[in-house]
Amino acid sequence: MYKNQLQELAQRSCFNLPSYTCIREGPDHAPRFKASVNFNGEIFESPTYCSTLRQAEHAAAEVSLNVLSSRVPSKSLTAKILDETGIYKNLLQETAHRAGLDLPMYTSVRSGSCHFPGFSCTVELAGMTFTGESAKTKKQAEKNAAIAAWSSLKKMSSLDSQDEEKEQEAVARVLSRFKPKEVRRRETTNQWRRRTSQQDSNKDLLIERLRWINLLTNQASSSSSTSTPNQHKNSSFISLIPPPPPPKSSKILPFIQQYKDRSSQEAKTETATEMINSKAKVNETSTRLSKQMPFSDMNRYNFVGGCSVNPYSLAPAVQMRSVIPVFAAPPPKPNPNLNPSSLSSSVNEFTSSNNSCSVLNTPGLGGQEKKNLTREMIKLGSESRILDQTHDS
C-alpha cells in the first residue's frame, strides 16, 4: 500500500525509484525487522521493529510519505497521489464493517463563490466526528476527511507500543470499543449460545460413543463367557468358507492301473474319511479365528450372489471314473487240428441245413409234415457224423 504510493510519487516527480535496506534481529524462531528507505537521497527509517520484512518496509514508506506531505513544495502532489485511489475511504469502510459498526457518513459543506468554490467535509463514525481540510472538489474533501479520521484513529490505537499488530486490525479493535451497549450485549449472547450449542453437541457425541463402547464390551464379555466352540464357529467368518477340495487324482494310465483293482466300497470309505478330516481342520481354524474376532456376527453375511452358505453341509465328493483304454478284438486263430474231411462235412452240413430250411419254407406243407421232415433230417445228420468219425479213426 504505502510502498506503491511512494513508488508512484517518485515516478511522477521524475526521481529514482526508492530503495530499501533491512536490519534483522532476534532468534530464528522469532525474528524482528527494521527497514529504511532511500527516496531522492533522503533516508527514512521505520519507527519500530516489525515481525515481518514487508511490514517494516511499509512502515518506512509510511514515514517518508508523512514527511513529504507535510512539506509545502510537494504537498499538493503528494496529497494528490495519496488520494487519487481513495485508499483511506476504503480502509475506513472496511475497518468499520469489521468492527461491526455502521458505515461512515460524510457531510460536505460548500463555501466560496461560484467561480472558485470550496468544500469542507466531515465524517461521522462510531459517534465521533472528524473534519478534513477544505478542497476544490467534493470528492477530494471527502478523501481529506477520511485521511483525518484514519490518522486520529491510528493515534488512539497507539500503534507504537503494538508494533507486531497490523494497522487495520488495531484500528478495528479501537472502533469496537465504541459499539452500542445493545449491539455488544447481542453479540455476547450470540457467542454464548454458539458455545453452549457446540458444547452440547460435543457432549452428545461423547455420550453416544461411550454407549457404543459399553455395548460392544458387554457383547464381547457375554460371547466369551457363554459361547461354545460351535457358537464361535457359527459367528466366525472363516466358518462360512467351504473346505478345500480334495486333491485331484492324476488321469495318467499307470496311476489308474494301481487303483483299478480296488473295490468301490473301499473308495467310498476313503473319501468319507478325507471329508471328515478336512471338516475337522476347518472347524479348528474357525474356532481359533473366532476367538480373535468376538464381535463378528457373521450369520448375517452372505457371499456374493446372494446365496448363503451352511458351514455344516459339505458338497458330495466327486468320483472320477477311471479311463480304461479300449482296444480292438484280436482276430480268431485258425485251428490246426482241422482236417479237410471235417471241413467238407461242415460244408455238407451247412448245405444240408440250407436245403432243409428251403424245403421247410416251401408253401403247401402242413405242420405235421414239417415235423416229420425235421426228424428225418436230424437222423440223417447224426448218421453222417458217425460215419465221419469212423472214417477218421
From Swiss-Prot:
User: Keywords, A to Z?
Assistant: Repeat, RNA-binding
Q: Quote the CDD domains the UniProt record gives.
A: DSRM_AtDRB-like_rpt1 (cd19907), DSRM_AtDRB-like_rpt2 (cd19908)
Residue ranges, annotated region (Disordered)? 220-251, 335-371
Tell me the protein's name: Double-stranded RNA-binding protein 5
Q: What does this protein do?
A: Binds double-stranded RNA. May be involved in RNA-mediated silencing.
**Source organism superkingdom:** Eukaryota
- In this chain the DRBM domain maps to 1-70, 87-155
Q: List the GO molecular function terms.
A: double-stranded RNA binding
Question: Does the record bear Repeat in its keywords?
Answer: yes
User: Which gene name does the record give?
Assistant: DRB5
- The disulfide bridges present are none
Q: Does the keyword RNA-binding apply?
A: yes
